[in-house]
Amino acid sequence: MTSRTAQVSRITNETKIQISISLTGGPIERPQPSLFASEKGANTAGPDDASQTTASQTIDIHTGVGFLDHMIHALAKHAGWSLIVECIGDLHIDDHHTTEDCGIALGEAFKEALGAVRGIKRFGSGFAPLDEALSRAVVDISNRPLAVIELGLKRERIGDLSCEMIPHFLESFAEAARITLHVDCLRGFNDHHRSESAFKALAVAIREAISSNGTNDVPSTKGVLM
């Protein structure tokens, strides 16, 4: 199995994003040079980051959108990834470009780190509760990008993240990662809980889908998943 690591940089007129990822956790190198070392007057990484370092994982997320940081942190933690995300976006406009582009960049990093779709289970599913909320996620590492997201969110915003951008982040991730993704919140009345349980369920599903199936075969009747 490959090292399952990747570094991705996505630079547009709207956002600057750098990502380092290890799908198996462990030590991870921070992108160099850091965006926050070179951008004066931009969003500055600090104690409000979604950061966590343990013996098995390093996670440091700074998108400039607090609730988005929180969701990506939950995804990385429960998927078993080490993940560093740095983003400087045009938040003076709104949160759309930052959220969408972070989803795209994370999907690209995931795809690159996974490498050839060979010797993995391919399919994964997961349930995750958070108090009264319960979500289900089903993943197919298929090279057939599609996302069906039903979270049933009622609020306009959670913190500084527009609720309409939460499913859009997942759609952007699935498109760039080239996976088929179904995520549903089955019940719950607190939109924070509904969203977080969805990201945790996705983490469980991805962790299963990319786990070894004990062979070196391509898990497809076609013989290819490119």
Swiss-Prot record:
Origin organism lineage: Eukaryota, Fungi, Dikarya, Ascomycota, Saccharomycotina
Region of interest called Disordered, as start-end residue ranges on this chain: 23-55
Reactions mediated catalytically: D-erythro-1-(imidazol-4-yl)glycerol 3-phosphate = 3-(imidazol-4-yl)-2-oxopropyl phosphate + H2O
PROSITE patterns: IGP_DEHYDRATASE_1, IGP_DEHYDRATASE_2
InterPro entries: IGPD_sf, ImidazoleglycerolP_deHydtase, ImidazoleglycerP_deHydtase_CS, Ribosomal_Su5_D2-typ_SF
Gene Ontology molecular function: imidazoleglycerol-phosphate dehydratase activity
Source species of the chain: Maudiozyma humilis (Sour dough yeast)
Protein name: Imidazoleglycerol-phosphate dehydratase
SUPFAM superfamilies, alphabetized: Ribosomal protein S5 domain 2-like
CDD domains, sorted: IGPD
Protein's pathway: Amino-acid biosynthesis; L-histidine biosynthesis; L-histidine from 5-phospho-alpha-D-ribose 1-diphosphate: step 6/9
UniProt record, GO biological process: L-histidine biosynthetic process
Catalytic class of the enzyme: lyase
Keyword line: Amino-acid biosynthesis, Histidine biosynthesis, Lyase
